[in-house]
Swiss-Prot record:
Organism of origin: Campylobacter jejuni subsp. jejuni serotype O:2 (strain ATCC 700819 / NCTC 11168)
UniProt keyword Ligase, yes or no: yes
NCBIfam families, A to Z: CPSaseIIsmall, PRK12838.1
Binding site for L-glutamine: S45, G240, G242, L269, Q272, N310, Y313
Glutamine amidotransferase type-1 domain segment(s): 188-372
Subunit structure: Composed of two chains; the small (or glutamine) chain promotes the hydrolysis of glutamine to ammonia, which is used by the large (or ammonia) chain to synthesize carbamoyl phosphate. Tetramer of heterodimers (alpha,beta)4.
Name recorded for this polypeptide: Carbamoyl phosphate synthase small chain
Claim: DNA-binding is one of the keywords in the record: no
Catalysed conversion reaction: hydrogencarbonate + L-glutamine + 2 ATP + H2O = carbamoyl phosphate + L-glutamate + 2 ADP + phosphate + 2 H(+)
Residue ranges, annotated region (CPSase): 1-184
Pathway(s) of this molecule: Amino-acid biosynthesis; L-arginine biosynthesis; carbamoyl phosphate from bicarbonate: step 1/1; Pyrimidine metabolism; UMP biosynthesis via de novo pathway; (S)-dihydroorotate from bicarbonate: step 1/3
SUPFAM superfamilies with a match to the protein in the record: Carbamoyl phosphate synthetase, small subunit N-terminal domain (SSF52021), Class I glutamine amidotransferase-like (SSF52317)
Keyword field: Amino-acid biosynthesis, Arginine biosynthesis, ATP-binding, Glutamine amidotransferase, Ligase, Nucleotide-binding, Pyrimidine biosynthesis
Amino acid sequence: MKAYIYLENDIFLSAKAFGKSGTFFGELVFNTSLTGYQEIISDPSYAGQFIVFSMPEIGIVGTNENDNESKEIFASGVLMRELSSSFSNFRAKESLQDYLEKHGKIGIYELDTRYLVKMIRNNGNLRAVISTEISNKEDLKIALEKSAKIDEVNFVKEVSTKKNYSHKQGVWNASFQKFNDAKRSEKKVAVIDYGVKTNILNELVEVGFEVEVYPYNVKADELITLYKKGEIQGVFLSNGPGEPRILKQEIAEIKKLAEAKIPMLGICLGHQLLSNAFGYETYKMKFGQHGANHPVINLDTKTVEITAQNHNYNVPEELAQVAHITHRNLFGDNVEGVRYKDYPIISVQHHPESSSGPHESKYIFKEFMNLM
């Protein structure tokens, strides 16, 4: 199956396609991870984006039932240099081709991804249309111009749960080939789901929390009431997709939670929403940070952690007026983590659940528990 690709900078490409046929729109971002493609593809934070893998060959270990970060795939599609013609892993259940087709997503291969990565690095993230139906450049250009801009779409309401649920499994136990059972806990955390990854919930359970997940539009007053009754001891603000500044109501609710002095931890989008709630607007980066090899310095311990990253937006330096900066990214020197002054709130831009990625930042979940 052949596919045609048109980028907003007037670049027109063709390649081979697999998975779902059709016409797809999104923003190109590149990811530098060498492994963990299933976790990356199933991360809800990629909603509305085409993932360009810098790793030359993808698909060699297939896919399995336990490495998904969500039940659905919200990314617009996946682009790679080479697609592995076979897969081999004792946990694998199906090929990447079958996996994408089952989830209704397109995959692109036999494409010069090094060229694309350099283009994104030099020009910033680019809007794109990929089609197996339209082969004419001008028709694709018109279609892209008519499509919605990613910064104007509220993807959070698409990826969030529609109703409350309890999460009762811990992390994957490789020795026993199953997820750990939930521990008995005296501390309960309310997770606001802006697009939460399954392994973040697993880590919260593993560290000793009872976990209840709420939709993105849960009201602060409901959670404040639960906190005052002692039915929850903290609130977790999850990762998620899209432009944080358009989430006006969610930011207002977080401001109420902060004013109530409820212990909170924010990761990725949650980190950005907290900054906006305190009056310090986030900004869009040129091409973001996506990968599992990003060095971050912990300014409190003077140690360097290798972290997993997936974001296009960042908090401003001015946030230091209300928060102590705890972490910095050594690739870009941007703010990576903060501890708010006079509030029991911490947040980080990177992903301490490390799925996929290094395990060096998992202590942050214990720091969250220590706030309570």
